[in-house]
Amino acid sequence: MVSDASKKKAAQKKAAAAAKRGGKAAAPSKSAATSSNGVDSLSSGVDALQISDRTCTGVLCSHPQSRDIRIESLSVTFHGYDLIVDSMLELNYGRRYGLLGLNGCGKSTLLTAIGRREIPIPDQMDIYHLSHEIEATDMSSLEAVVSCDEERLRLEKEVEILVQQDDGGGERLQSIYERLDAMDAETAEKRAAEILFGLGFDKEMQAKKTKDFSGGWRMRIALARALFIMPTILLLDEPTNHLDLEACVWLEESLKNFDRILVVVSHSQDFLNGVCTNIIHMQSKQLKYYTGNFDQYCQTRSELEENQMKQYRWEQEQISHMKEYIARFGHGSAKLARQAQSKEKTLAKMERGGLTEKVARDSVLVFRFADVGKLPPPVLQFVEVSFGYTPDYLIYKNIDFGVDLDSRVALVGPNGAGKSTLLKLMTGELHPTEGMVRRHNHLKIAQYHQHLAEKLDLELPALLYMMREFPGTEEEKMRAAIGRFGLTGKAQVMPMKNLSDGQRSRVIFAWLAYKQPNMLLLDEPTNHLDIETIDSLAEALNEWDGGLVLVSHDFRLINQVAHEIWVCEKQCITKWNGDIMDFKRHLKAKAGLED
């Protein structure tokens, strides 16, 4: 007899399948953009075309008034490719989830689907999806943060109207005051200022118009808005990408206290360890759940996979023995034939009950930079260099240092201290105001920075783009060169606009490596890379025999590859006496945060 639970599950799957055939989300809830808090309106504006490229189905199984979310039979398709198939999404109130998975598996697509309510999220749950920077307007950064709390502004305007009435507003006014008190409305501006300060905005910057900030700083303002609103569901996609190390430390400590539902995609293992209470792993088109932070996830996953492989091998050995026995004695004497039939029944029972699957291993990428040999020092030397974009404002003053092919240097310091400027002085893109930069005649420098992605012709496939960049190269040789950075098969020949940001980053690394430099300057190379790819990059850099200067907000990558930490601050460059984790503890102490 079929159980009620089985009937319910079958009905859910049937509903999901019907919705999928219709190309719409199952049981869609109305947008909360019209709700009292208006949070969703902040993250709206995705084109209809983008939405039509994505198909989502799922059945809400948790109670509509519950603070926890459980969606079964979840499937997500993007450009006709299945990203998630018949899985379960479970988000519990008070938990902070790290969403992991290889580049291109659909992490950002899943966040967008949740943020756009393309899967059934209860109406009373407000969502903030940090996906893009705020608009450039005449509003100050502080005003941009405070003004985003539409519910508070609406209630304060209603108070102004009610107090003018003859009855003084009555019960309605009292209920509004209670709500404003719960929202801590009187200290709204103070809270907004504290958040902005933590993200690197001093008082002068808080008064500055948003249109006068770069895209990276406007993304910080958008992050400040998300933290200020405190939505029920907060979705963050690589929130540390535009932050310096100091702001990363502050954000990590701030999110530790987020007591609603947080889902964060991050390539920083250190950040995930500090923030997350749970991990969701996207693998084989399924969502798998683990309790604990990133390190605990790694340990638990390793133990589970080891046990799974032991069970798999045992089952396969049993199956092999039984099949061999059946084939050998199935037509023998009556006694042996009965035993063979018994084993046949046992085998059929095992198969009906479901056999243990072989562990699906994530494909391990192996990056490789060609060895270039040594050059006699000095290779790159700064002699009493001063530099400023204007005569009245010097970023560096009388700095002296040298970098050789044995150097493995990480540049750290607050945003605006001149880390990227120093890299441009090294390449010759900028010239010193005073002093001299000496480069060896045979020094070949290659620089990675985020703006390289903007130069990619996204209409072209990666293979054709590389063939045009390096004319005369044989196609097979170029395929191999791109493949060394984890882009293989169809990914090489489809337009790059259909690749994930992480896959495009791999194209850039392949382009840099093909230049065969003997010194690499890497400015935030981990943005958009998954954790496995970052580990492969670190391994390749450690095996390479060239010089390295690194700017990164990823504490773990710095710890993996850097031999020296140079602090850029107050027009100077100072060598830090310790490793990067010592520097992190220093930043926490400086900000008055507990270790």
From Swiss-Prot:
CDD domains: ABCF_EF-3. Disulfide bonds: none annotated. ATP binds at residues 101-108, 413-420. Residues 69-309, 380-595 form the ABC transporter domain. It comes from the Eukaryota. One of its GO terms (cellular component) is plastid. Residues 1-41 are annotated as: Disordered. Pfam families: ABC_tran, ABC_tran_Xtn. PANTHER family: ABC TRANSPORTER F FAMILY MEMBER 1, ATP-BINDING TRANSPORT PROTEIN-RELATED. This is ABC transporter F family member 1. The gene is ABCF1.
